[in-house]
Amino acid sequence: ISMLQHDFSFDSAGSYTVRFAIEMLMVYFLEENFDPKYLAMVAKIQSDEYYINMMIAWYFATALAKQWDSTLQYLTEERLPLWVHNKTIQKAIESYRITQEQKEMLRRLRRK
């Protein structure tokens, strides 16, 4: 939680620390403690590491289920790297927490 109160830098943190921080945001800050700035924090993370990118996609897929309106703009505005964008859509479509109508919309947002 202290990372949210201080100038935590994802850039200087190790892979495990980054993944752990994203998971904490996903678990504790997508419902009653939600703030759209957390979406922006995660979207700014740039990495070539598979597990970091998978964690980012998992975070955004979960965010779609819990904060649809705030999260959808990251896909419609193409604010995520291509791989993360498409993996987010894949994971969200696999979720039981997303409606069929939402899944159809997400399918149309896939990028090539």
Listing of model-derived features with the role each one plays in the protein:
Residues I1-K112:
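Alpha-helical scaffold domains
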